């Protein structure tokens, strides 16, 4: 599924994301996954991969097998569904631990300017 910008904003609100950080989250998602829930990235230099709307990494956060594991206690395939509840819970856990530093897409594109969501 690909969200529109406002569709993403509405879904993130539904998932309980902090309104004060909403533009950061939208920017992160737009730069990491282009708002696609099922995106699997190319292999990273360290051999890991990133999954889903928030591009969550399998080195630390999700398990590649069929048994949920790692720090979010989920399988990576659970991060690829149109229902973003599991992915959102994991993304918020990552944020709580590292702020936005875990995401190069945020670091490279969102640190100083964020998208306009005032019409949403």
UniProtKB/Swiss-Prot annotation:
Its EC number is 3.2.1.17. Signal peptide: none annotated. Coiled coil: none annotated. Keywords: Antimicrobial, Bacteriolytic enzyme, Disulfide bond, Glycosidase, Hydrolase. InterPro entries: Glyco_hydro_22 (IPR001916), Glyco_hydro_22_CS (IPR019799), Glyco_hydro_22_lys (IPR000974), Lysozyme-like_dom_sf (IPR023346). GO terms for biological process: defense response to bacterium; killing of cells of another organism. It comes from the Eukaryota. One of its GO terms (molecular function) is lysozyme activity. The keyword Membrane does not apply. It is an enzyme of class 3 (hydrolase). The active site is at 32, 50. The keyword Hydrolase applies. Belongs to the glycosyl hydrolase 22 family. Lysozymes have primarily a bacteriolytic function; those in tissues and body fluids are associated with the monocyte-macrophage system and enhance the activity of immunoagents. This is Lysozyme.
């Amino acid at each position: 599924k690909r969200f529109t910008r406002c569709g993403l904003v509405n879904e993130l609100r539904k998932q309980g994301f902090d309104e004060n950080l909403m533009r950061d989250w939208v920017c992160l998602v737009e730069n990491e996954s282009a708002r696609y829930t099922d995106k699997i990235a190319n292999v990273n230099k360290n051999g890991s991969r990133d999954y889903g709307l928030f591009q969550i990494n399998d080195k630390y956060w999700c398990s590649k097998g069929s048994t949920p594991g790692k720090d979010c206690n989920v399988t990576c395939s659970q991060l690829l569904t149109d229902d973003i509840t599991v992915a959102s819970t994991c993304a918020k856990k990552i944020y709580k631990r590292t702020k936005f530093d875990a995401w190069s897409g945020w670091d490279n594109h969102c640190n100083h300017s964020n998208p306009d969501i005032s019409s949403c």
